[in-house]
């Protein structure tokens, strides 16, 4: 069974690296986007199961 595909939307590189390092350590599949516009493009292209974003 594939783990869920997670879209990480984060503009702060240190926070993004912390999140993606943790996801990678647990063998999760993930995509990243730096902002809302990039998130919309990634979500429409890849249909993630979960979106993590800051407000």
PLM feature spans:
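Active-site residues of response regulator receiver
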Residues: 54
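Conserved acidic carboxylate
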Residues: 10
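A generic structural motif
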Residues: 26-30
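Acidic, metal-coordinating helix/loop segments flanking the phosphotransfer/catalytic sites
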Residues: 32-50
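Conserved alpha-helical interface elements of two-component signaling phosphotransfer modules
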Residues: 13-17, 37
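Non-catalytic signal-transmission and effector/linker regions of two-component phosphorelay proteins
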Residues: 1-7
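Charged docking surfaces used in two-component/phosphorelay signaling
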Residues: 17-25
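N-terminal functional modules and adjacent low-complexity/disordered segments of proteins
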Residues: 2, 13, 48-50
